[in-house]
Amino acid sequence: YISIPSASAVPRAVFEAVGGFPEGMKIGGDMYMWIKIARRYAVCFSPKPLANYSKVASNRSALSYTPERTRYSFEELYDPSAPEEYNEFVARAALGKALIISAKGGTKEAARAAEFFGYTKTYRRTLRKVRVLNALPRSWRAPLIGLYNSLAWRIARKGL
């Protein structure tokens, strides 16, 4: 990740220069803004843990979904003249968002992201997950992705 929002220090002038958070974008707005910041400014990373992240914290915004009404899209962050790593990171952010949107029933939006960001070489697994999830009945998607994430989290913590 470019930035974990709870552990970021960004001057107000930088937020203002990149236009702040994208108005109307409910999912991925923070990542959208971090990408815009990293495109224009130097970003420093410290491997030292400076914040804790809780996987069990409640996320009220995840409880309901209504389609976004925004003029902003990760597609506009794609830059054919940028280094491959940059566009791969944009694809990663967009496909992660597409997974959430598909799980919540946004079939068309997720399919559009899968088509546009199908160029990814690094995040083929995420691309396949979006396509598979999108092919399932809507009522199956959220429980299935929840089960997948739960199992992946347990395996990562305890190993096989």
Task: Annotate each predicted stretch with a short phrase.
Residues 102-160:
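Membrane-interface aromatic/basic loop that binds lipid-linked glycans or pyrophosphate carriers
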Residues 98-99:
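Conserved small-residue packing positions in alpha-helical repeats and bundles
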Residues 9, 66-92, 146-160:
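C-terminal, non-catalytic tails of nucleotide-sugar-dependent glycosyltransferases
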Residues 49-57, 61-88, 106-120:
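Catalytic core of nucleotide-sugar-dependent glycosyltransferases
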